[in-house]
Amino acid sequence: MMVALPGASASLVLFLAAFLPPLQHAQDPAMVHYIYQRFQVLEQGLEKCAQTTRAYIQDFQEFSKNLSTMLGRCQTHTNEYRSAVDNLALRVERAQREIDYLQYLRESDFCVESEEKTSAEKVLQEAEEEKKIRTLLNTSCDNMLMAIKSLKIVKKTVDPEGSWMKDAGSTSAKVYLLAGSRNNTVWEFANLRAFMEDSVKPGPRKLTLPLSWQGSGQVVYQSFLFFHNQGTSNEIIKYNLQKKTVEDRMLLPGGAGRAPIYQHSLSTYIDLAVDEHGLWAIHSGPGIQGHLVLTKIEAGTLGIEHSWDTPCRSQDAEASFLLCGVLYVVYSSGGQGPHRITCVYDPLGTVREEHLPNLFFPRRARSHSMIHYNPRDKQLYAWNEGYQIIYKLQTKKKLPLE
């Protein structure tokens, strides 16, 4: 009786059969068949073991890949947490300084103030406050705006909102472009010609900030970029453009940053400005329903020097700027032209609206997302629906202080 033995089992059986003695009786074929079956079972077990091993190897490779990905994410989160802790430490340190200062004021007030304070003392205090303001704003700058003479369209970009500027505190010719109302990329051009003509070499330098700005109220002053930190209501960042590091930060007091300050520029909650007196902030305030608040900031220490509640409303406003310590607010109807200055605020009281002619801007179809004055070249830098514009100004001397 012959039995067909396929594959490796047949080979093994034939190999063993070569060493067996000749068949002696009829039971030998049954024995061979039995051995063949046992080898088949063994072969199937080995194949199953191999399949299981391959599955384990594949699972281990997948596990290693997932573990590597998770370790990478863990490293990223670790860096983010470390940065957040460093920022928190800075804010805690600043808060501690402010608490110490408030404690000092409280102790001083407790020692000085009393219920028997006379009206004469109040008058004296008001006089001292007025003297402080006059000292703060007492510079050789004595000009007031009389007309917007002309405009020059410098460039066109795809972003309807943004800001562009020169350093208002140095003689540098560099031009900075900050496209969009929420971004962290600054483009630095060597000069105005390089900004206007893309073919001019070298090309712009790209600066990536560690934090994003909010709105279009950024300024460059004395080689520092000042901007409203996105995701916060009232935090101002001072960024060193040369070292590429965050130099300092501050919190504007009161209700700053709680609401947009211009009806026709809803992405801007804090508008920073620079004039001959230095750094300013225009923002909302607590209990000031729809009115702008003007705050003078010491650029070196980011300390608050003084704040004023202005009569200028945010309704129909689109932008504002300061010139020689005077706030000029630009308004338009429904975000369309004509664009005109209808509210002027001077903390010293020397410039009033009745002293000024009708201040109209050359006609533009849409509202401005930013208008900033540069005290170096005495011009306005503006952003209007993607167009970067320069406005030339006509000024005259202020009336003398009474």
Curated annotation (Swiss-Prot):
Highly N-glycosylated. It comes from the Eukaryota. Residues 140-397 form the Olfactomedin-like domain. The keyword Disulfide bond applies. Residues 1-28 form the signal peptide. Disulfide bonds join 141-324. InterPro entries: Olfac-like_dom, Olfactomedin-like_domain. Keywords: Coiled coil, Disulfide bond, Glycoprotein, Secreted, Signal. Glycans are attached at residues 66, 138, 183. Pfam families: OLF. Its main location: secreted. Residues 73-135 form a coiled coil. GO terms for cellular component: extracellular space. GO terms for biological process: signal transduction. It is found in: Secreted. PANTHER family: OLFACTOMEDIN-LIKE PROTEIN 1, OLFACTOMEDIN-RELATED. This is Olfactomedin-like protein 1. It comes from Rattus norvegicus (Rat). The lineage of its organism: Eukaryota, Metazoa, Chordata, Craniata, Vertebrata.
